[in-house]
From Swiss-Prot:
Disulfide bonds: none
Cofactor binding, note field: Binds 1 potassium ion per subunit.
Binding residues for Mg(2+): 227, 248
GO CC, any one term: cytoplasm
Occurrences of domain TrmE-type G (ranges): 213-366
Uppermost EC category: hydrolase
Primary gene name: mnmE
Keyword Cell wall biogenesis/degradation carried by entry: no
UniProt keyword list: Cytoplasm, GTP-binding, Hydrolase, Magnesium, Metal-binding, Nucleotide-binding, Potassium, tRNA processing
Name the record gives this protein: tRNA modification GTPase MnmE
GO molecular function, one term: GTP binding
Cofactor(s) for this UniProt protein: K(+)
Length: 441
């Protein structure tokens, strides 16, 4: 495949101390001559230089890093210009590069890295996840995937299928020369692989949830302090807070970081019997959010601690954290037992109990989303689809059928696993993966 030499700004557009402009392709070194750099640039060494435009006017003083293929991110010759982050300077350099090279499209540098076998598709997805990560745990998950945790797992499964397929094809072609014990073991091997695939898929979508955010709905009766707590955790005034019950009608969301985990807290309408049609819709949405959330904070006002609210108490289950709100006069930090449920007393206005609540959230999240070194999480719907397809094929294999049919099923399963890592890559799959990147990556 013949590809043009491409260029793009790799750092965010805007004023900054330093900007990085990348060039990749077989003609990348021609940029030196174009910018009037007469001295030789040593590969993999930071070199100070002046850049000149086509009129011989100086553009900027820069640091140049030159990577010779295949020892670069893309596997091609790569030149990086580390310039001052002036918009004027960036525009002038990009304009000069545009005279001899082609602007890169979104994700095109990473696409070339994939095409040149520098990364597989799971690592490519991890790159964009790392760029988009906002919390420590999101970044750690992406880095684990970039290090090849998923690739190694999927390649090992794929190799197992290839080994089985090889034995069957050998039997088809040379039945008298194949050890019958090798064929007798196929059912056992496929059963083991099926169990591994099922275990991998039955992960409660932890990787995807960690990537997108862990949802926690705040629910309770009207005026129980839900919006006040929501604003306090979000550290800004998002929800309207008033003394009038039923102020919150719709759900509101805010992203926060709890011990490195990405949490999406949801403020909801107060749950009660209401004749107001709009409030009824808000209550319906509140219950739906509570049902679909990963966890929920169920709030009960301190002054109503002895009043059994059947509708609120019915919301409490194993994924609930119970909070006794407006406990302004409580100085102890111990949990309080109410109707056989343990409540943590908090006072937002006095800033009491909030750290205990956050620690409870941390404990719940850590328990459910703890990394496992031997079983990395699936992190995208694309991966899940192909793993599920592989499982379906393996599960439905009938070893009583002619070996030619079994061999074809094995080829299909090998192909599905190949699509996960990109060994077999349809164009629409590549467009879907790399189209999510920004220009310059």
């Amino acid at each position: 495949m013949i590809m043009s030499t491409i260029f793009a700004l790799c750092t965010p557009w805007g004023k900054s101390g330093v900007a990085v402009i990348r060039v990749s392709g077989k003609d990348a070194a021609k940029a030196f001559l174009h910018f009037g750099i007469s001295s030789s640039i040593k590969p993999r060494t930071a070199t100070f230089a002046h850049l000149y435009n086509s009129k011989g006017e100086i553009i900027d003083e820069v640091i140049i890093v030159y990577f010779v293929a295949p020892s670069s991110f893309t596997g091609e010759d790569v030149v990086e210009f580390h310039t001052h982050g002036s918009l004027a300077v960036i525009k002038m350099i990009l304009a000069e590069l545009g005279k001899i090279f082609v602007p890169a499209g979104p994700g095109e540098f990473s696409l070339r890295a994939f095409l040149n076998n520098k990364v597989d598709l799971t690592r490519a997805e991890a790159i964009v996840d790392l760029i988009n990560s906002e919390t420590e745990m999101q970044a750690k998950q992406a880095i684990r995937q970039m290090s090849g945790a998923l690739e190694k797992l999927y390649q090992s499964w794929r190799q197992q299928l290839i080994d089985i397929l090889s034995n069957i094809e050998a039997y088809i072609d040379f039945p008298e020369e194949v050890n019958s014990a090798a064929l007798a073991n196929i059912g056992y091997l496929l059963n083991n692989l099926q169990e591994s695939l099922e275990c991998h898929l039955n992960d409660d979508r932890k990787g995807e949830r960690l990537r997108q955010g862990i949802y926690i709905a705040i629910v309770g009766e009207p005026n129980s302090g839900k919006s006040t707590l929501f604003n306090h955790l979000a550290k800004r005034d998002i929800a309207i807070v008033s003394e009038y019950a039923g102020t919150t009608r719709d759900t509101l969301e805010a992203h926060i970081d709890v011990a490195g985990y990405p949490i999406v807290i949801i403020d909801t309408a107060g749950i009660r019997d209401s004749a107001d049609l709009i409030e009824q819709e808000g209550i319906r949405r509140a219950k739906l959010k509570a049902e679909n959330a990963d966890f929920k904070i169920v709030m009960l006002p301190y002054e109503k601690r002895n009043v059994f609210n059947n509708e609120i108490m019915n919301l409490i289950d194993e994924k609930s954290i119970c909070v006794l709100s407006k406990a302004d006069n409580i100085t102890e930090h111990e949990l309080i037992s109410i109707f056989n449920f343990s409540f943590v007393p908090i006072s937002v206005c006095c800033n009491r109990g909030i750290e205990i609540l956050l620690n409870l959230i941390k404990q719940r999240v850590e328990k459910d989303f703890q990394f496992c070194s031997t079983h990395p999480f699936i992190t995208s719907e694309r991966q899940r689809l192909h793993i599920q397809n592989t499982l379906n094929i393996v599960k439905n294999m009938d070893l009583e059928l002619p070996m030619e049919i079994v061999a074809e099923d094995l080829r299909l399963s090998v192909r599905e696993l190949g699509k996960v890592v990109g060994v077999i890559s349809d164009e629409d799959i590549l467009d879907n993966v790399f189209g999510k990147f920004c220009i310059g990556k």
